[in-house]
Amino acid sequence: MPEKKKLQLGLSFAPNAVSNLEQIEDYITENGNSDLATKVVDKILDRCEDLTVMPKSGKPREDIAHGLRSVTSGMYVIYYRIHSDKIEILRIWHGARDNAALIGEI
């Protein structure tokens, strides 16, 4: 049987998501482990890239905003939307943060 080709969507990061990644890296680095900071950010970016092949792998988060989905990467939650041509990463927050704070920000 022929192998199915997986369609791959583009990937974009909203300014807030870029800022979130920078804050995560800075926080871990400031607490003494720049190698760990790099590994955590790389793992988050890998998970974001996975979404371009499996966009619906995340959990629908209609409780926060229409069309919003989320996946986890370690202790972090990646919030995103699926568009016709790309995955848009909107926020990347520590899992302990209050989701209610997202309402109105996405």
Across the structure, where does each feature detected by a protein language model lie?
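Basic/aromatic recognition patch in beta-strand/loop cores that engages polyanionic ligands
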Residues: D46, K56-K86
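Arg/Lys-rich, positively charged N-terminal/basic patches that mediate binding to nucleic acids
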Residues: M1-K39
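Enriched for short, Lys/Arg-rich terminal
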Residues: Y76, R81-I106
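Residues at alpha-helix boundaries and the short loops/turns that link adjacent helices
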Residues: N31-S34, L51, A96
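Alpha-helical transmembrane segments and membrane-interface helix-loop junctions
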Residues: F13, E25-D26, T38-V40, D46, ...
